[in-house]
Structure formats: C-alpha cells, structure tokens
C-alpha cells in the first residue's frame, strides 16, 4: 500500500466567541505542481473549522478508488484526538452529541466521515505535531537542527498556507 503524507493547518483571527478571518492549508510534500498545496481564506470563521477544512481537503485529494495509507500531520489536538481517542465514533453512536450537547462543527465532521466512507481502500493515520517549534526556539543551533526535520518543514508549509492574508479574496461561507 502506498503512503501519502499530508500536513494540515487552519487558523483564524478571532476574539472570544466571535468569528474572524481565517484560512487553511494542506501540503503534500511528495506531490508536485498544483496537487502539492491547497489553501483557501474565509471571512467569519473559527480556527476549529479551518483545521477541519484542511483535513477535509486532504482526504478529498485522494482518489476514491485508491488503496493508500493517508498520514496526516496536524498541530490541532482537537482534530487528531477526535480520531486517536475514538471521539468521532462515539459522537456518531450518540447521534452527534457529546457531554456538552451537540458536537461543534457537526457539518464538517459529517462531511469528513462521508469522504472517509467513500474511500474504503484508504487507511487514515493521524499524528499530532507541535506547532511553531522553529519560531519558539531561541538557540540558533537548535533552530538550525529543527530546520532539517521534514515534519517541521511540512508543518511550517501548512502554517504558511493557512494564513488568510495570502488570499486576495476571502470566501464568505466556510461550508463544504
């Protein structure tokens, strides 16, 4: 089974419960040309929605009949733990409810689940990666060493793609 690696990131500039401008990025380091990177920017959204949108578009980039192992690196614990801790399965079994009530971003979670179901030959592995490691590192030698790590580079690429300011036009709806 072939392995496809993707780095995903989402971000939004929000204050409290308000929505703000945001974007997401999906980066495939082993692909080339227009298939290597994808991003969109939005008005009136939140970070969680952008993180999920990045995952959604990474999944939809895989052909329905492909027998591949899709490995997603994400700095979003919310997204990664929803898979690794089995939260998504629990939400589905509970009618899209959790201990706080209705699952947030249910429309995106349903769309992700649908796309996964459409790809029965694909397996999905979710891996959490710490964000902004290079920017946080003060020591120059350690910073240089971090820049040699392909996972750090992939995360940085997805982070740059997720910046809504790189888009000349922001979409008004973040619905998939």
Residue locations for each model-derived region?
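RNase H catalytic domain
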Residues: 11-17, 55-153
């Amino acid at each position: 089974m072939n392995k496809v690696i993707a780095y995903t990131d989402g971000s939004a500039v929000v204050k409290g419960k308000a929505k703000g401008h945001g974007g997401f990025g999906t980066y495939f380091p082993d692909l080339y040309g227009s298939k290597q990177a994808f991003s969109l920017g939005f008005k009136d959204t939140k970070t969680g929605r952008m993180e999920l949108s990045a995952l959604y578009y990474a999944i939809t980039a895989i052909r329905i009949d492909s027998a591949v192992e899709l490995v997603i690196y994400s700095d979003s614990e919310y997204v990664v733990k929803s898979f690794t801790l089995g939260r998504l399965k629990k939400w589905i079994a509970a009618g899209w409810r959790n201990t706080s009530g209705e699952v947030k971003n249910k429309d995106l979670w349903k769309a992700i689940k649908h796309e996964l179901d459409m790809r029965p030959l694909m397996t999905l592995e979710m891996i959490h990666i710490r964000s902004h490691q290079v920017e946080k590192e003060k020591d120059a030698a350690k910073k240089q060493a971090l820049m040699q790590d392909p996972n750090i580079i992939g995360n940085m690429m997805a982070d740059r793609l997720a910046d809504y300011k790189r888009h000349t036009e922001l979409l008004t709806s973040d619905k998939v």
